[in-house]
């Protein structure tokens, strides 16, 4: 698959397909969106929000969560605020999310089946990584949105005046419901 993508890319560049996407690094709407990496949202999310190329910084991860105050999603939001002029943040979870009810136990069995050893997992734990917490999903989507919004709003590096709001998007219709 990757080789096919590389071949496509060569044609894309040769035909100057990139020209209609040219923009600068600053989001025109001074907006960042933290959302799930679910494939159903790849085109639906920006379309349902009326966002075009260059309008917003879109940060995606499993579940659209900030799981700790200094994880990579939070780091990206801090960079968006201070380096890219973001003034508003939308946290957008979605219906029927695969991160809901994720568990380390499931991942553990999958990892072992694919050749990861217990010794490797034990070494990771001895290094201070709580895999159970790190790979844990959430049970309640609105509550996960609330927690993420609160983590962002109360973060010591987020300046006063940054607007943070939380939503759930229907992953079929694109309907947006404000949660927090």
Model-derived regions: residue spans:
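Divalent-metal-activated hydrolytic enzyme cores
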Residues: 1-29, 64-69, 81-84, 99-180
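Conserved beta-strand-loop surface patch within small alpha/beta domains used
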Residues: 15, 19-74
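Short beta-strand segments
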Residues: 34-36, 60, 92-94, 167-170
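Gly/Ser/Thr-rich loops at beta-strand to alpha-helix junctions
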Residues: 38-40, 95-99
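Short secondary-structure capping micro-motifs at structural edges
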Residues: 74-81
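Ordered, amphipathic secondary-structure segments that act as subunit-interaction surfaces
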Residues: 82-94
């Amino acid at each position: 698959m990757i080789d096919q993508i590389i071949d496509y890319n060569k044609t894309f560049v040769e035909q100057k397909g990139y020209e209609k996407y040219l923009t600068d690094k600053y989001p025109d709407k001074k907006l960042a969106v933290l959302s799930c990496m679910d494939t159903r949202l790849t085109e639906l999310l920006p379309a349902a929000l009326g966002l075009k190329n260059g309008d917003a910084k879109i940060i995606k991860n499993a579940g659209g969560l900030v799981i700790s105050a200094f994880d990579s999603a939070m780091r990206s939001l801090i960079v968006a605020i201070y380096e890219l002029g973001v003034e508003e943040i939308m946290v957008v979870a979605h219906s029927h999310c695969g991160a809901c009810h994720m568990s380390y136990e499931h991942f553990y069995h999958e990892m072992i089946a694919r050749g990861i050893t217990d010794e490797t997992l034990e070494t990771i734990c001895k290094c201070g990584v709580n895999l159970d917490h790190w790979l844990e999903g959430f049970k309640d989507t609105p509550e996960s949105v609330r927690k993420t919004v609160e983590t962002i709003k109360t973060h010591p590096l987020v300046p006063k005046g940054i607007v943070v709001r939380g939503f759930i998007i229907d992953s079929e219709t694109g309907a947006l419901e404000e949660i927090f």
